[in-house]
């Protein structure tokens, strides 16, 4: 499995206040541009966060200069720092892409005549080996038992809801209480891939955990800002980060000796478990919100090889 990139701690609210005013003004114009282009909120957040990190590096190491004054060597210096701090190839490509997109915007608005990132060669794409896990019924049972022992209702709900709804991690991260119909066991108008609004369907186990979590939040008087899943960094506008849910997933995987477990595995596993239990491929595909059953069959269903081998044994060839 590909090793996750090391996290570099740039964030500092005091330093953000000291960032070159011209850089902040240009960033604000870029925010408006992204909003007009209707980029997903998560995409805008990721771009802004990456640019803040770069601005803080400029503040600390390059005399807080304007991005309009920087040359390709200055940007290369920042990228070299990130590489030495442990960022992997995929993370480095993201950093280059974000800075390049920002400069393309500045060039389009005639703040610049050239994009200095054009002179920087991106690292070659690494070959990532991603372990795809299809949880067995036995592993799901073990997961439930371990999560009961840890007494973390939010973590239990995350695992059970992800498996039951088979929703993508980006959708899970943005769920709000007011979308949930407890009686019908449906979560309405969930923003999914390509901007589609879909409904998610959950089981009785999830329904009980939702009620339990709601009661715990009420007793503790915690302000979750309306989000189903939250941490102390959430606000009215900012939901939980996907990276936090990935950490939760890794923790769950360690409980059941599946260290490679990642959020999308709940989606694969739920689909395969339903198919092997007798649900039609067409119905599974609908629940996954796929355009066709071909995608479902090729990437989301693990064939029951034991059953196929048993059938094969009936033929004496």
What are these regions (language model features)?
Residues 203-258:
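Active-site/catalytic core of tyrosine-dependent DNA strand-transfer enzymes
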Residues 180-182, 259-260, 279-299:
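Short, polar N-cap/turn motifs at the start of nucleic acid-interacting alpha helices
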Residues 112-114, 126-142, 194-205, 221-225:
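DNA breakage-rejoining catalytic core of tyrosine-based enzymes
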Residues 160, 164, 267-290:
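C-terminal catalytic core of tyrosine-transesterase DNA break-rejoin enzymes
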Residues 128, 140-169:
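Basic, Lys/Arg- and aromatic-enriched nucleic-acid-binding interface segment
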Residues 165, 174-209:
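Conserved tyrosine-mediated DNA breakage-rejoining catalytic core shared by Y-recombinases
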Residues 10-13, 28-130:
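N-terminal core-binding DNA-recognition domain of tyrosine recombinases/integrases
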Residues 3-4, 201, 298-317:
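DNA/chromatin major-groove-contacting recognition/catalytic segments
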């Amino acid at each position: 499995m590909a090793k996750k990139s090391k996290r570099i701690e740039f964030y500092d609210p005091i330093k953000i206040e000291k960032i070159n005013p011209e850089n902040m003004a240009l960033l604000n114009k870029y925010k408006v541009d992204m909003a007009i282009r209707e980029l997903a909120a998560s995409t805008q957040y990721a771009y802004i966060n990456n640019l803040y990190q770069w601005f803080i590096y400029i503040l600390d190491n390059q005399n807080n200069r304007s991005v309009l004054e920087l040359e390709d060597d200055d940007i290369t210096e920042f990228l070299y720092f990130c590489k030495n701090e442990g960022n992997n190839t995929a993370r480095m490509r993201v950093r280059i892409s974000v800075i390049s997109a920002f400069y393309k915007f500045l060039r389009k608005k005639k703040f610049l005549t050239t994009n200095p990132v054009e002179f920087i060669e991106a690292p070659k794409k690494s070959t990532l080996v991603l372990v795809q896990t299809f949880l067995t019924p036995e592993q799901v049972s073990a997961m439930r038992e371990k999560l009961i022992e840890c007494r973390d209702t939010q973590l239990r709900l995350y695992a059970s809801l992800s498996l039951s709804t088979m929703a993508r991690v980006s959708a899970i991260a943005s769920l709000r209480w007011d979308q949930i119909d407890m009686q019908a066991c449906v979560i309405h108008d969930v923003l999914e891939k390509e901007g589609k609004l879909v409904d998610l369907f959950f089981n009785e186990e999830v329904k009980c955990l939702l009620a339990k979590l709601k009661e715990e939040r009420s007793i503790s008087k915690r302000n979750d800002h309306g989000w189903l899943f939250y941490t102390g960094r959430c606000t009215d506008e900012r939901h939980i980060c996907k990276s936090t849910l990935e950490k939760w997933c890794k923790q769950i995987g360690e409980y059941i000796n599946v260290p490679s477990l990642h959020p999308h595995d709940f989606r694969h596993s739920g689909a395969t478990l339903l198919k092997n239990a007798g649900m039609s491929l067409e119905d599974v595909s609908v629940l996954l919100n796929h355009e066709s059953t071909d995608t479902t069959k090729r990437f989301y269903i693990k064939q029951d090889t034991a059953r196929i081998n048993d059938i094969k044994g009936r033929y004496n060839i």
